[in-house]
């Protein structure tokens, strides 16, 4: 089995792409809930920063809060489409746009405990920052070494998620302008953070860019009742899911079932849309 590799976990909005200073037209819902692909614009220096981190041997994993889904402003399909637009702006080979991206995977927390209009998303989910769920899932699914990993984000809750996941606090960097009540940023932007990461650690163990297919998580939760309460039913659903994955060529990394929900991790760029979540 391949040895675990280090990662740089990246917040999305105002770390990789513009958000806070976008015009009102960019946000049909709440300001900050970016789910229109046409408004995705990289911040200065981001492409070169991602390329240098990738060349140094780091997996690049987006961990982002997208509660617009819970608030009813958009769907997981919209979030995935926005991620696709971001991936397209970060090609592994600039001479061949449309090919593999520098981004290995994108994880999104779509729940909100108090603002959700969708009952099944009105929870304080372990993927919500500053909880570490997204990072821990990525480490498990992508075979990542958290002890050698970094996190870069623009908010304290980003940093908190990294620390809660067990990352060295010195490797959890806040970037961006000063924020009221927050400590000073560690670096002005991702470009500066990337220079620091490569300088301080000498990068990972790889010397070439490694491209993997993004892993995504699809969750289906019953609104009423416990349709999977019967163990036989759960076994039948699990067998059917694995058979469908095998027939369609989708790599099913893991499958978890309980009495009300199914959670599948797929090595597929856009599984959420395929599952109709």
Model-derived features: positions:
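Short, basic/glycine-rich phosphate-binding loops at helix/coil junctions
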Residues: 20-30, 61, 107-120, 214-223
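Short catalytic/metal-binding and nucleic-acid-binding patches
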Residues: 206-277
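Active-site neighborhood of HAD-like aspartate-dependent phosphohydrolases
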Residues: 1-61
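Short beta-strand segments at enzyme active-site cores
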Residues: 59-65, 104-109, 255, 264
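Hydrophobic beta-strand scaffold residues
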Residues: 60, 169-172, 252
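Short, solvent-exposed loop/turn segments at secondary-structure junctions
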Residues: 68-73, 159, 265
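A short, N-terminal amphipathic alpha-helix
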Residues: 43-57, 85-95, 245-246
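Asp-based, Mg2+/Mn2+-dependent phosphohydrolase catalytic module
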Residues: 2-4, 8, 77-80, 84-104, ...
């Amino acid at each position: 089995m391949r040895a675990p590799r280090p990662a740089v976990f990246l917040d999305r909005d105002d770390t990789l792409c513009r958000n806070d200073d976008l015009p009102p037209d960019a946000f049909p819902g709440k300001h900050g809930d970016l789910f229109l692909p046409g408004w995705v614009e990289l911040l200065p220096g981001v492409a070169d920063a991602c390329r240098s981190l990738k060349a140094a041997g780091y997996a690049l994993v987006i961990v982002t809060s997208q509660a617009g889904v819970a608030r009813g402003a958009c769907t997981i399909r919209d979030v995935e489409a926005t991620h696709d637009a971001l991936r397209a702006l970060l090609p592994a080979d600039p001479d061949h746009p449309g090919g593999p991206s520098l981004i290995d995977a994108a994880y999104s927390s779509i729940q909100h405990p108090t603002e959700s209009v969708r009952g099944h998303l009105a929870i304080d989910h372990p993927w919500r920052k500053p909880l570490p769920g997204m990072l821990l899932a990525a480490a498990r699914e992508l075979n990542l070494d958290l002890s050698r990993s970094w996190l870069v984000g623009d908010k304290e809750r980003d940093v908190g998620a990294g620390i809660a996941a067990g990352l060295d606090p010195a490797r959890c960097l806040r970037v961006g302008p000063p924020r009221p009540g927050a400590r000073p940023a560690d670096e002005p932007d991702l470009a500066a953070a990337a220079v620091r990461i490569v300088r301080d650690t000498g990068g990972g163990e790889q010397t070439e860019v490694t491209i993997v297919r993004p892993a995504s998580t699809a969750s289906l939760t019953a609104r009423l009742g416990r349709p999977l309460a019967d163990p036989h039913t759960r076994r039948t659903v699990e067998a059917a899911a694995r058979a469908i994955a095998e027939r369609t060529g989708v790599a099913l990394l893991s499958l978890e079932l309980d009495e009300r929900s199914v959670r599948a991790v797929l090595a597929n760029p856009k599984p959420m849309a395929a599952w109709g979540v």
